[in-house]
């Protein structure tokens, strides 16, 4: 790692439709190849689907899903005396949200529905209810940290 000055955090503008910074960040996570308008169309379409299917406010479902997906602990590899140990470490708040959004996107991409909007809507609804592939991923990470609790004294 370079020992230069710390890079300042970029200020992400809130999303124009919902006025939420979290939605804006998720659009950026969803975006591929710099096509932001396509990512926005997909997300807003998913939000419309959520409102139709669940009858709840789409933004509420989204924030609940993200908060359900945030991991508390994760494991990091650390080399000690010729052996690699999976050391459980607490996740920083900014990274919690970033991981939750990435897991949500990846889980939605792996689903079987026809369009990405439908996949994302279904995954968001499931995550807000505490089930689905993204929740499974978070549980798996927590399980790994629990299993390697014995190595927690190898702090970073």
From Swiss-Prot:
Transmembrane annotation, as ranges: none
Quick one: a GO biological-process term for this protein? translation
* GO CC, one annotated term: small ribosomal subunit
> Signal peptide location in the record?
none
User: Is-annotated flag, keyword Oxidoreductase?
Assistant: no
Q: Which Pfam families match?
A: Ribosomal_S7
Instruction: Offer an example of a GO molecular function term for this protein.
Output: structural constituent of ribosome
InterPro entries referenced in this protein's UniProt entry, alphabetically: Ribosomal_uS7 (IPR000235), Ribosomal_uS7_bac/org-type (IPR005717), Ribosomal_uS7_CS (IPR020606), Ribosomal_uS7_dom (IPR023798), Ribosomal_uS7_dom_sf (IPR036823)
Keywords assigned by UniProt, alphabetized: Ribonucleoprotein, Ribosomal protein, RNA-binding, rRNA-binding, tRNA-binding
As for what it does, the entry says: One of the primary rRNA binding proteins, it binds directly to 16S rRNA where it nucleates assembly of the head domain of the 30S subunit. Is located at the subunit interface close to the decoding center, probably blocks exit of the E-site tRNA.
Provide the assembly information.
Answer: Part of the 30S ribosomal subunit. Contacts proteins S9 and S11.
UniProt cross-references to NCBIfam families, sorted A to Z: rpsG_bact
The family line of this record is: Belongs to the universal ribosomal protein uS7 family.
Protein name as it appears in the record:
Small ribosomal subunit protein uS7
Q: What is the lineage of its organism?
A: Bacteria, Pseudomonadati, Pseudomonadota, Betaproteobacteria, Nitrosomonadales
């Amino acid at each position: 790692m370079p020992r230069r000055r710390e890079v300042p955090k970029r200020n992400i503008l809130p999303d124009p439709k919902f006025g939420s910074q979290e939605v804006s960040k998720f659009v950026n996570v969803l975006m591929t190849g710099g096509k932001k308008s396509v990512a926005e169309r997909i997300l807003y379409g998913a939000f419309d689907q959520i409102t139709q299917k669940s009858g709840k406010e789409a933004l509420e479902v989204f924030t609940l899903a993200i908060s359900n997906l945030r991991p508390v602990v994760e494991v990091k590899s650390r080399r000690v005396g010729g052996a690699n140990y999976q050391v459980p470490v607490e996740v920083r708040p900014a990274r919690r949200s970033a991981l939750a959004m990435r897991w949500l996107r990846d889980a939605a991409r792996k689903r079987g529905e026809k369009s990405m909007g439908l996949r994302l809507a279904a995954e968001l609804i499931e995550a807000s209810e505490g089930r689905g592939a993204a929740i499974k991923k978070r549980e798996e990470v927590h399980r790994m940290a629990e299993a390697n609790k014995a190595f927690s004294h190898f702090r970073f």
